[in-house]
């Protein structure tokens, strides 16, 4: 593994000691562990010899951009560097930063310790200490026994706050160390910034939303204009959390002194900081971010047929780095397949990205036209397993050859079998499902509840009449209504003394007509309990069928299902055939179930935790709109990309918060913030800091609710904790006085811990 060091620059007369400082950086970066990418953002020709003289270094590349007529944008230059970086992790290294070889070794070791190749949501800042002129001379003229001892000497001087050495610190600095995939996905720097000023804080704000180390400050959006770490106020203090810990491990850069630079139009401090607050609030409210950046190392060009104002667009951004050069356009801009084909040919598009192609008739026509012309495409939608999604270049659901036996029937190794067995065990015993279900109650409880006795159970889960698979892949049943007719026929002909038919409506479908002669489970009854209870499962083509195979239950399909193959689920041709299958022995081939599941888990399905917003369709039925997907693994085109999970928060009792006064001082700051704002409520999670979305939500101009871990006031009859919360809300002064008095003997009422 290597790390790409990105150096953005434009060499001019005003760039102090440009050649000397650049050469020093290159000499100090270990070639075996780092690659160097210089982004030449419009250096005039008369200074080009400085860069030409560097081309002999094997670990260095120079990207030249003809941007000399534009204001120098260090943010844009960094973005370009990430787009062309060949390594999975990047480090931003400005020309005035100084670190010796040992310091870069420490940075490399930190990246390895965090496994940042496979944990993409993790990041840190290399703290930067701005040296005085004397401090710069001292650093560059030092003659220590080793680089390690030199770094210890400098670290001590910084720690002891020698004013003649360091002018000021920046713990949450622009020297970010970040995963390339993640950076491309969030879009890099906002294109709204002009010149220099505040652009790094916007990036840090968004990066930190995926990895929150603690509660955000009560006045988070406030620019305190101070980088000190003794007061937990404003966003600068919050971003410092991403550099304090690595500084304590001896990792830092020194910013070498230089005369004040005067570049017309470059410094846009006032304008950009005003813009920063608006961008931060937009992101917190609506997840507004710049468009994802193209990955220049993937030469394909992909057209995404998607509305960039939609929540789906925001949710899929961590898929985009896989698809090279990115073009985003609404499908409605193409009146028919001919107009789409013209655009593809004119703009040299290599691939089309579709959301569910059966989502509407217009999209389906475009999809079928693209397939007919053998144009490469990719289809994205939710899978049948919890947290599963698929990127399929063969088709959609039943119409895809990705599920054909030749794709998945292969001998598994013992390790592969163990992997699948472990997944199936966890799936069967988990409460996690695609749709909301109540807590599990066991199949034994249901057997008593429904008075099953010794009878067998046929479980029938219904689907929504408007779903894609019940509309386009309805097969022999024809429709949900047709399938209900099957169930009614079977109910009339199955001996009631031998069988019980238990039906369950889809959680979002409240108005489906009921079938006579069957039992109905409550809408929120846990689907796993019902499957576990069943002897056989009859359905159209629901994902419940795939989960039922994990329980090794015989599954009979009345419609076209992608998992209906010999040894797995069995297709029925009509209601009479379905009845015969119910009455006869039907076996599930465990070996084939393991093979199919291994294929799904390692070749077809990607996985990511998602959040949804509930809304109403135009016909009044309930509907869920995707809000966010935090992918942890992506399977695409025989590649597996591990993204990892969003790191957990850190306890307020951790040394990370000592400089801010620890838990007690930080809670006092929240209390003081409440006193200054009218009607503020503090709602505190007394267990852990786990939610990376902790922030203040302003409910009105004069009233706000400080949400820590998004835990809201409990409206139920209060117990001991509830009474304390009420006291906290109504009389915060008395609450905190009592809490401080009792802190030594009772530390469990008001705390953050892991």
Q: Could you say what each language-model-derived stretch is?
A:
Residues 12-29:
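Short, well-formed alpha-helical segments that are part of the catalytic scaffolds
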Residues 16-18, 440-507:
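Conserved catalytic-core segment of nucleotide-activated headgroup transferases in glycan assembly
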Residues 17-18, 195-300, 683-686, 734-749:
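C-terminal catalytic/acceptor-binding lobe
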Residues 40-54, 485-521:
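Catalytic donor nucleotide-activated moiety binding site of glycosyltransferases and closely related
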Residues 68-84:
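Glycine-rich, basic loop-to-helix element that forms the pyrophosphate-binding segment
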Residues 82, 106-191:
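Conserved catalytic core of nucleotide-sugar-dependent glycosyltransferases
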Residues 87-100:
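Short beta-strand-to-loop acidic/aromatic patch adjacent to the donor-nucleotide binding site
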Residues 399-448, 568-684, 688, 723, ...:
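Leloir-type glycosyltransferase catalytic cores
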């Amino acid at each position: 593994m290597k790390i790409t060091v990105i150096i953005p620059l434009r060499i001019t007369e005003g760039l102090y000691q440009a050649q000397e400082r650049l050469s020093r950086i290159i000499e100090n970066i270990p070639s075996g562990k780092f690659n160097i990418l210089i982004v030449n953002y419009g250096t005039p020709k008369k200074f080009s010899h400085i860069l030409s003289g560097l081309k002999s270094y094997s670990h260095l590349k120079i990207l030249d951009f003809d941007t000399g007529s534009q204001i120098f944008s260090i943010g844009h230059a960094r973005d370009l560097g990430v787009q062309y970086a060949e390594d999975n992790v990047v480090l931003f290294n400005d020309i005035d930063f100084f670190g010796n070889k040992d310091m870069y070794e420490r940075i490399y070791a930190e990246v390895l310790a965090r496994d940042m190749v496979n944990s993409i949501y993790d990041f840190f800042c290399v703290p930067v200490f701005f040296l005085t002129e004397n401090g710069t001379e001292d650093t560059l003229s030092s003659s220590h026994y080793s680089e390690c001892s030199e770094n210890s000497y400098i670290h001590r001087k910084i720690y002891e706050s020698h004013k003649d050495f360091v002018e000021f610190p920046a713990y949450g600095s622009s020297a970010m160390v970040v995963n390339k995939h993640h950076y491309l996905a969030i879009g890099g720097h906002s294109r709204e910034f002009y010149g220099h000023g505040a652009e790094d804080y916007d990036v840090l704000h968004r990066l930190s939303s995926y990895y929150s180390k603690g509660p955000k400050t009560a006045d988070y959006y406030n620019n305190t204009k101070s980088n000190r770490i003794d007061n937990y106020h404003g966003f600068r203090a919050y971003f410092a959390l991403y550099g304090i810990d690595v500084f304590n491990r001896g990792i830092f850069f020194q910013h070498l002194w230089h005369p004040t630079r005067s570049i017309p139009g470059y410094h846009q401090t006032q304008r950009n900081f005003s813009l920063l607050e608006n961008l931060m609030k937009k992101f917190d409210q609506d997840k507004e971010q710049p468009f994802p950046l193209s990955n220049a190392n993937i030469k394909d060009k992909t057209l995404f047929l998607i509305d960039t104002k939609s929540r789906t667009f925001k949710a899929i951004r961590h898929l985009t780095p896989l698809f090279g050069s990115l073009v985003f356009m609404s499908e409605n801009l193409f009146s028919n397949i001919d107009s789409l084909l013209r655009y593809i040919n004119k703009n040299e598009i290599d691939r089309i990205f579709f959301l569910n192609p059966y989502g509407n008739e217009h999209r389906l026509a475009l999809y079928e036209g693209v397939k007919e012309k053998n144009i490469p495409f990719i289809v994205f939608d939710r899978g049948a397993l919890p947290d599963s999604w698929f990127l399929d270049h063969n088709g959609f659901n039943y119409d895809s050859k990705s599920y054909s036996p030749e794709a998945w029937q292969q001998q598994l190794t013992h390790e592969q079998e163990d992997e699948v067995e472990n997944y199936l065990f966890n799936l069967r015993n988990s409460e996690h499902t695609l749709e909301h279900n109540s807590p599990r109650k066991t199949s034994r409880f249901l057997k008593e509840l429904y008075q099953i006795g010794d009878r067998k159970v046929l479980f029938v889960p219904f689907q929504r009449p408007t779903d894609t698979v019940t509309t386009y892949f309805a097969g022999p049943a024809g429709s949900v209504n047709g399938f209900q007719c099957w169930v009614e026929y079977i109910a009339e002909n199955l001996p009631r003394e031998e069988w019980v038919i238990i039906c369950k409506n889809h959680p979002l479908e409240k108005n489906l007509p009921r079938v006579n002669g069957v039992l109905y489970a409550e809408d929120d009854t846990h689907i796993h309990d019902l499957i576990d209870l069943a002897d056989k499962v009859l359905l159209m083509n629901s994902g419940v069928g795939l989960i039922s195979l994990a329980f090794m239950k015989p599954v009979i399909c009345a419609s076209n299902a992608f998992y209906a193959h010999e040894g797995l689920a069995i297709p029925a041709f009509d209601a009479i055939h379905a009845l015969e299958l119910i009455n006869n022995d039907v076996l599930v081939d465990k070996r084939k179930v393991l093979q199919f599941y291994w294929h799904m888990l390692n070749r077809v399905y990607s996985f990511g935790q998602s959040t949804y917003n509930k809304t109403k369709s135009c016909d009044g039925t309930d509907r869920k709109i995707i809000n966010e997907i935090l992918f942890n693994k992506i399977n695409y085109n025989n590649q597996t990309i591990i993204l990892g999970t969003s790191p957990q928060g850190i306890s307020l009792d951790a040394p990370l918060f000592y400089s801010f006064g620890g838990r007690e001082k930080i809670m006092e700051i929240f209390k003081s913030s409440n006193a200054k704002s009218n009607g503020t409520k503090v709602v505190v999670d007394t267990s852990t800091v786990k939610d990376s979305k902790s922030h203040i939500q302003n409910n009105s101009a004069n009233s706000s609710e400080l949400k820590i871990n998004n835990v809201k006031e409990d409206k139920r009859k209060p117990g001991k904790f509830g009474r304390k919360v009420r006291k906290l809300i109504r009389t915060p002064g008395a609450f905190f006085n009592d809490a401080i008095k009792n802190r030594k003997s009772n530390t469990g009422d008001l705390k953050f811990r892991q």
